[in-house]
A protein has these predicted regions:
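Membrane-proximal, glycine/serine-rich, low-complexity loop/turn segments characteristic
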Residues: 1-4, 29
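Strand-connecting loop/turn motifs
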Residues: 4-8, 61, 93, 154, ...
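Extended beta-strand-rich architecture
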Residues: 90, 134-332, 375
Length: 383
């Protein structure tokens, strides 16, 4: 909605649904997420510390956003309130877009945790998931970030870096605040996160003719918790598998490393890590009308940077990680309506690092549909 001063106000609503597999002891088996975001965009830099010539750039904008996210899982409910002030500007001649998150505040609130999940995995200090306890408590995240994207239609690149908690940690030490029983500084009795995170994505499109193309993609991410955080916040951790990753696995079903759960119930919650690698190749061809076909090969995994007893085989090691790269292959059907694309991907496991025996590790040689097949529905291309 434009205003008289050329400012623009927008509201965005999103929803997601996931049917969770392999969960026992819970009455609900579904994951539902709703979110709403309001943005007020000014078509100029609102920053007195910048030069007038820089602020006059027509492609620059300042943005104030407020959002609310509601996540309902069988094990817990999570609410995230966020507000941010950021700057964006573009260099069309060089196909570049820049973003600075000057200040991004997030408050993570946990209104409900299932008694089953709480008793089995959070309250028992000897339980193998005790190290993740703080990820299911209320939390503040105060971060700053920088991002750059490049896209000329053939090559696309995206890089982001963010840090959180450094200003709060410096203030806590300067004012001589005391730590809580968990060894953390708090703000209004709520701990704040401290970490650094870097993400990089690159895609190359080889267009053979109007009907056929090959898309190559590589993605890498690494995040390190320190200071006031022993592990990354749940929202900042990496997961593998799903419609935009290694498509032979469902969301959060792969990794870290060669880790494989032993109870078969709740381990997918812990299948997250601090480092992620994705490698993808997808051949795309036009079929008829709005239908397009695809054949893809995906590879990747996630790892932890530290060794956790709770995730054996999950730590990244330079001399072992390449043996833990999962591989999948499959076919896809897409409905391309120009303004949006409906995507149906069917993936099969080819190499499963969670198993060492030949029949399950080399799934491409010994395929089993019930064990190795994954179906994905999504909107838009995977990369």
């Amino acid at each position: 909605l434009p205003s008289h001063g050329s400012e623009q106000f927008s509201i965005e609503l999103r929803g997601a649904y996931e049917a969770i597999k392999g969960l026992e002891g819970y009455t609900d088996q579904n994951y539902i997420e709703y979110s709403a975001e309001a943005k007020l965009m000014f078509p100029r830099f609102l920053a007195p510390f910048l030069s007038k010539s820089f602020r006059r750039r027509q492609t620059a904008s300042s943005e104030l956003s407020v959002s609310w996210d509601m996540q309902n899982r069988p094990e817990f409910y999570r609410r995230v309130f966020s507000t941010a002030w950021r700057y964006r500007w573009a260099e069309p001649r060089h196909h570049l877009n820049w973003r600075i998150d000057l200040l991004d505040l997030n408050y993570v609130y946990m209104p409900w945790i299932s008694p089953t999940f709480k008793n089995d995995y959070l309250d028992d200090a000897d339980n193998r998931n005790a190290i993740l306890r703080y990820n299911y408590e209320d939390l503040f995240i105060m971060k700053i970030g920088f991002g750059i994207t490049y896209n000329n239609g053939i090559d696309a690149m995206r890089a982001n870096i963010e840090t959180a908690g450094n200003l709060l940690n410096g203030a806590a030490k300067a004012f001589g605040l005391k730590k809580n029983g968990e060894g953390q500084y708090t703000l209004f009795n709520i701990a704040y996160a401290q970490y650094a995170k870097f993400d990089f994505d690159y895609t190359h499109l080889m267009q053979f003719d109007k009907r056929n193309a090959l898309a190559l993609h590589a993605g890498f991410g690494i995040a390190y918790p320190y200071g006031n955080s022993r592990v990354l916040p749940f929202e900042k951790r990496y997961f593998s598998g799903g419609d935009n990753s290694v498509r032979g696995w469902g969301v959060r079903e792969l990794g870290p490393g060669k880790f494989r759960g032993t109870d078969g119930r709740i381990d997918f919650i812990n299948q997250t890590g601090d480092l992620k690698l994705d490698l993808n190749a997808e051949y795309r061809t036009s079929l008829f009308w709005k239908f397009q076909g695809a054949f893809f090969v995906d590879a990747g995994n996630i790892w932890t940077l530290r060794s956790y007893d709770e995730q054996p085989g999950g730590q990244f090691k330079l001399d072992e990680f390449y043996k833990q790269i999962a591989v999948a292959y499959g076919l896809g059907i897409r409905l391309n309506f120009d303004y949006f694309i409906l995507r149906f991907d069917m993936g099969m496991k080819a190499i499963n690092p969670a198993y060492e025996n030949e029949q399950e590790h080399w799934a491409i040689i010994h395929p089993r549909l019930s064990r190795d097949f994954a179906f994905h529905f999504a909107v838009g291309f995977p990369f």
